[in-house]
Amino acid sequence: MLRVAVPNKGSLSEAASAMLSEAGYRQRRDSRELVMVDPDNDIEFFFLRPRDIAVYVGRGTLDVGITGRDLLLDAEVEAEELLPLGFAASTFRFAGPVGDFASAEELEGKRLATSYDGLLRGYLAERGINAKVVRLDGAVESSVRLGVADAIADVVETGNTLKAAGMEIFGDPILKSEAVLIRRAGGTTNGTAKEVDVLIRRLQGVLVARQYVLMDYDIRKELVEKAAALTPGLESPTVSPLRDSDWVAVRSMVPKKETNRIMDELYDLGARAILVSSIHACRI
């Protein structure tokens, strides 16, 4: 049975469970449940703190897990990323008092507060920057005002909290993070490789289904090539004959975010009966 770690709370939890549900896996109905078995798919889910998931997977206690890329790197364990999942995006950045710093190199000899000391130490070591890392469990924005640190390194989404604390972002991003599927480095060791492959394919199918729609339309034969240039699909659009031999029906997958633009251009080209359908699931 495949053993999978899922975040039990926070911004990762709801989105991870929704994605697994879309992939056809049973998910818990009570947020107090810590373990749930899906017998139909021969899989067992363990709901854990997001920060602990990389540790369990890295030690081989669990086969795979969903966590943040930032949490994976911060854990400094023998686990590797299998698949980016497209949600919980964030950026790990340096911030300091307005006007005090312009680049990471200026942090030499300074005190840096963070909740991600493993990730930060690795970044500083790669660049040969000697700075004192001060680990805090949260509210690192207050550390500079309280005299604990000269600057901070933290996950930034909007930057509003930093501005309220009289701070600004500086330097290049330390890391661009999102939710990821991870496994122990070197692969699973308990004969679950096939089940992991199925899980990856299903999650990839959800990602594609979220990013694309199916577009159907009718168009005159002589305009098919021009229409196909607008809707090339993943390999090629499907073209089917109609009762009126001068016309054909075309079906193609198109990026969801470009749907209305493509519909407008097809209509201007001469296409009619343009319809769009959602994709529930797919295998590409």
Curated annotation (Swiss-Prot):
Coiled coil: none annotated. It catalyses: 1-(5-phospho-beta-D-ribosyl)-ATP + diphosphate = 5-phospho-alpha-D-ribose 1-diphosphate + ATP. It is an enzyme of class 2 (transferase). Feedback inhibited by histidine. Keywords: Amino-acid biosynthesis, ATP-binding, Cytoplasm, Glycosyltransferase, Histidine biosynthesis, Magnesium, Metal-binding, Nucleotide-binding, Transferase. Its cofactor is Mg(2+). This is ATP phosphoribosyltransferase. Catalyzes the condensation of ATP and 5-phosphoribose 1-diphosphate to form N'-(5'-phosphoribosyl)-ATP (PR-ATP). Has a crucial role in the pathway because the rate of histidine biosynthesis seems to be controlled primarily by regulation of HisG enzymatic activity. It comes from Pseudarthrobacter chlorophenolicus (strain ATCC 700700 / DSM 12829 / CIP 107037 / JCM 12360 / KCTC 9906 / NCIMB 13794 / A6).
